[in-house]
A protein has these predicted regions:
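Active-site rim helix/loop that mediates acceptor-substrate recognition in acyltransferases
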Residues: 40-61, 65-71, 75
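Conserved acyl-donor/pantetheine-binding loop and adjacent beta-alpha core of acyl/acetyltransferases
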Residues: 78-113, 117
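Conserved beta-strand-loop-alpha-helix junction that forms the acyl-donor binding cleft
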Residues: 116-125, 151-160, 176-182, 187-188
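A short beta-loop-alpha structural element at the N-terminal edge
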Residues: 14-28, 39-40, 78-79
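Conserved GNAT-fold acetyl-CoA-binding loop/helix
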Residues: 31-50, 84, 90, 94-97
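Conserved N-terminal entry element of GNAT/NAT acetyltransferase domains
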Residues: 1-21, 32, 188
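Conserved active-site alpha-helix within GNAT-family acetyltransferase domains
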Residues: 127, 131-135, 143, 156-173, ...
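Conserved GNAT acetyl-CoA-binding A-motif
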Residues: 111-113, 125, 134, 141-153
Length: 188
């Protein structure tokens, strides 16, 4: 996408709170963030996003719209809710075994704002929408009184780690999430 097209797209972009009727789109985002975008969105995952007590609830999401369409989304929330919401969410995830759940590290802690899942649809990538969603999530955390934001970045995605570093995040520790190695990154 050229500079003029990027400028136009940014001028036509807005971020809004997700609504319950965004649940299927959020399920797509979560699959995309997990590099599973070739999977069909299941009714189970959509139902998880439609609930109000799960990690992936529409209440924890913001939607980026560009040119009148949903272009991407960010799921973020206070670490304070993580353990309770995880205990509800993970058993509902299709195909996830108890052994996988037990082997997954804690992603976030109380007292921090967690950026859980981010994805931008392919036709809207490289236009700054992902950065807008990240900065929006950081601002939401700050407005809620959190001074630290965290996220996980897959170790094998060096370009993502570099991107998050440019946005002010620093590697803090290593985490295992559903069998994959991640960096826990922090922005203070």
């Amino acid at each position: 996408m050229n500079r003029t097209a990027n400028d136009f797209l940014n001028a036509q972009s807005a971020i809004r709170d997700a609504r319950e009727d965004d649940a299927e789109f959020l399920a797509q985002v979560i699959l995309s963030a997990a590099h599973l975008s070739d999977m069909d969105v299941s009714e189970d995952l959509t139902a998880i996003c439609r609930r109000t007590d799960t990690l992936y609830s529409w209440r924890n999401a913001r939607i980026a719209c560009a040119c009148g369409k949903r272009a991407g989304a960010m799921v973020s929330y206070p670490g304070d809710i993580y353990l309770a919401a995880r205990s509800i969410t993970f058993p509902l995830l299709p195909g996830l075994t108890q052994a996988q759940i037990d082997a997954t590290d804690i992603e976030t802690l109380p007292g921090e704002w967690y950026l859980d899942s981010l994805a931008v649809l392919p036709e809207f990538r490289r236009a700054g929408i992902g950065k807008m969603l990240i900065m929006d999530a950081i601002e939401r955390g700050r407005n809620a009184g959190y001074t630290q934001c965290t996220l996980l970045a897959e170790k094998s995605s060096t370009h993502l780690v570099e991107y998050y570093t440019r946005l002010g995040f620093a590697i803090e520790s290593s985490k295992l999430y559903l069998g994959n190695a991640y960096w826990r990154m922090v922005r203070r």
